Design a protein with these regions (language model features):
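Conserved alpha/beta enzyme-core scaffold
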Residues: 2-174
Length: 175
C-alpha cells in the first residue's frame, strides 16, 4: 500500500477499500471545481405516488442485493429507529456486505454492531458515534470505515465518490 504525507506530516494511505483517495492538505489547498455526478433532476419531477403498503413492500421494490450502498437521513438523530428497523429486515433476508452511508449514527443504533461483526455491514461511510464509533475504532469491520461530516457526505455524493443504491427516509403517509 502506498503512503503519502498529509498536511500534518502524517503518513496516510493513497487507497482505502480499493478506491484512490487524496490526503487532506489544508483548508485551501484544494480549490474544488470537482465534477458533478449524474444529470440534473427536474425540480418538479412527477414520479407519481411512491407510497407502498409497508416497509417490506418498499424493500421488495428496491431489489436490494449483497454489497449495495444503503443510505439514511438522520433528522431524528438519537430518536431514529428507522435505521435499526431496516437493517433488522435486511439481515433477516440474509443480505451481506452492505455499505451503510448514513448522515450519522448515534447511540440508539448501537445494536448495529452485531451486523458489523456478522458481516451484514461491511463498512460505514458517514458519521459514527457511540457504540458504532467504538466498533469502528476497534477494527470490527470487514473494510475500513470512512468518517464523513454531513457536508462531506453531500460533496462525496455530488462528486460521485459515494454512489447510493437505496435511500430510506421517514415520510408521512398521505391519505
Amino acid at each position: 500500500m502506498s503512503m503519502v504525507k498529509n498536511s500534518l506530516g502524517r503518513l496516510v494511505p493513497t487507497e482505502v477499500n480499493g478506491r484512490s483517495v487524496r490526503p487532506f492538505m489544508g483548508a485551501h489547498a484544494d480549490a474544488g471545481g470537482g465534477m458533478r455526478y449524474g444529470g440534473s433532476i427536474p425540480a418538479a419531477a412527477r414520479y407519481g405516488n411512491k407510497l407502498l403498503a409497508d416497509l417490506d413492500a418498499a424493500i421488495d421494490a428496491c431489489e436490494i442485493r449483497d454489497g449495495m450502498v444503503i443510505s439514511f437521513h438522520h433528522h431524528l438523530r438519537n430518536g431514529d429507529y428507522l435505521v435499526n428497523l431496516v437493517m433488522d429486515k435486511l439481515a433477516a433476508r440474509g443480505l451481506k456486505d452492505l455499505v451503510l452511508a448514513p448522515s450519522a449514527l448515534f447511540p440508539t443504533h448501537g445494536r448495529l454492531a452485531e451486523y458489523i461483526e456478522s458481516g451484514v455491514i461491511s463498512h460505514i461511510e458517514g458519521s459514527m458515534n457511540g457504540p458504532i464509533g467504538r466498533a469502528c475504532s476497534l477494527g470490527k469491520m470487514k473494510k475500513s470505515a470512512i468518517l464523513r461530516s454531513h457536508g462531506g457526505r453531500y460533496r462525496a455524493i455530488q462528486d460521485g465518490d459515494l454512489h447510493i443504491d437505496v435511500a430510506f427516509k421517514i415520510g408521512r403517509a398521505h391519505v
